[in-house]
Swiss-Prot record:
Name of the protein described by the UniProt record: Apolipoprotein F
Swiss-Prot/TrEMBL keywords: Cholesterol metabolism, Cleavage on pair of basic residues, HDL, LDL, Lipid metabolism, Lipid transport, Secreted, Signal, Steroid metabolism, Sterol metabolism, Transport
Function text: Minor apolipoprotein that associates with LDL. Inhibits cholesteryl ester transfer protein (CETP) activity and appears to be an important regulator of cholesterol transport. Also associates to a lesser degree with VLDL, Apo-AI and Apo-AII.
Family per similarity comment: Belongs to the apolipoprotein F family.
GO cellular component: a single term: extracellular space
């Protein structure tokens, strides 16, 4: 059972009733009872329980430089944070972000990935012993290829590896079951793309990076069993081609920096005869979808008050 995250200001006389993390705010747990795939009509009928900053702080766009990242990077970070938002009870944000993910990955594949990631989080993942250094290099190389040097340079120089506001969010959500796991996964990938390897390692501890790698392997049908095959068939070609390149780059980098990771027994060996999309087609689809991420995620939504 998930929980809704509400941040509130309380007096000293009642502060002991909640789990407080600062002198001016606390975290209140409220049971969550809404299914994963809610249509807009049902989401609209839910009471406006999401607190503006506690929920907005979990949105991908709250991460500096996110809007300049290429589509695959946005999809991976967004997928993890979408599940964090659901566990936190931020229903309007969940649906709005999910619509953005649909545009990149397709409806069927995205829904299957959401469910698969939830299953992985509950304990259905193996230890891949992923090299964060190699994954960071692979993510940066793919970003350079997809978005072009100038855009990547602007993204990588947008911030340093330490961000006080993001760290404050992390300090709270890491204490919340499931929310913290998904948030750590999303920000581990984010910092890896930003070439903040130490920060990515910090967020990727306790299996978060392994979870992300398992997700990548599922997207190309090399993990997840029948689910992986369904996802691979349904995933949009441009995104799938990006994942295939990313995995290839990872193994190239991993072979240079570390010994080969342990391979799951049920995972086939990666071959170069996977489906390829030409670079021109990839860039064309990327350009046609990139603008969607710049739009506001929420419209006509009533938020509760929040104080840090």
């Amino acid at each position: 059972m998930g929980a809704q995250l509400l941040t509130c200001t309380v007096s000293d006389s009642i502060r002991h009733q909640f789990s407080c993390f600062a002198t001016s705010c606390c975290v209140l747990w409220v049971p969550k009872g809404v299914s994963t795939m809610l249509p807009p009509s049902q989401l609209g009928s839910q009471p406006p329980t999401s607190d503006p900053l506690s929920c907005q702080a979990l949105l991908p766009r709250s991460l500096p430089g996110f809007t300049h990242m290429p589509p695959l990077s946005k999809f991976l970070v967004g997928l993890a944070l979408r599940n964090a938002l659901e566990e936190a009870g931020c229903w309007a944000d969940v649906w709005a972000l999910q619509l953005q993910l649909y545009r990149f990955g397709g409806v069927e594949a995205t829904q299957a990935l959401i469910r698969h990631l939830q299953e992985l989080q509950k304990g259905g993942r193996a230890d891949w012993k992923v090299s964060v250094n190699a994954l960071s290099s692979a993510l940066q190389l793919l970003a350079w290829e997809q978005a072009g040097p100038k855009r990547v340079k602007r993204s990588l120089s947008n911030m340093g590896c330490e961000n006080e506001q993001e760290q404050r969010v992390h300090n709270v959500v890491e204490l919340l079951p499931a929310v913290g796991t998904y948030y750590n996964l999303g920000t581990a990938l984010y910092y890896a793309i930003k070439n903040c390897t130490d920060k990515a390692k910090e967020r990727g501890r306790d299996g978060a990076i392994d979870l992300g790698y398992d997700l990548l392997m599922t997207m190309v049908g090399m993990s997840g069993g029948p689910t992986g095959a369904v996802i691979t068939a349904a995933l949009k070609p441009a995104l799938k081609a990006g994942v295939q390149r990313l995995i290839r780059y990872y193994h190239d980098e991993e072979g240079v920096t570390t010994s080969q990771p342990e391979t799951r027994k049920d995972a086939p060996t990666y071959r170069d005869d996977v489906e390829e999309t030409t670079m021109s087609n990839l860039v064309s689809e990327v350009e046609s979808t990139t603008s969607n991420w710049g739009r506001p995620l929420l419209k006509n939504y009533v938020f509760l008050a929040y104080k840090r």
